[in-house]
Amino acid sequence: MKKIEAIIKPFKLDEVKEALQEVGLQGITVTEAKGFGRQKGHAELYRGAEYIVDFLPKVKIEIVIGDDLLDRAIDAIRRAAQTGRIGDGKIFVSNIEEAIRIRTGESGLDAI
């Protein structure tokens, strides 16, 4: 099993969710996040004063899937989240040793 963590622009969430559903994924976890990468922060005006905003709003998507869906899920996220501009985000993949459904006690792929 693999865990995909994708940090994307918030306005791309619906497109990514739909793309993942088309691949056959049944559930995702979404968390609001703030961060910066190469694009750093940006300046905003508020009541005539300029402020530097260090952290930009992002959305973090977490998915645990079987190894067989990994490449399709990554491709779906990339295609749906890409704008071609700085700050499109990152995708991280890690191994999951075990998954357990709390309600039923199912484990492994049956739990996801």
Task: Go through each PLM region and give its residues.
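Positively charged, small/polar-rich N-terminal and surface patches that mediate targeting and assembly
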Residues: 1-112
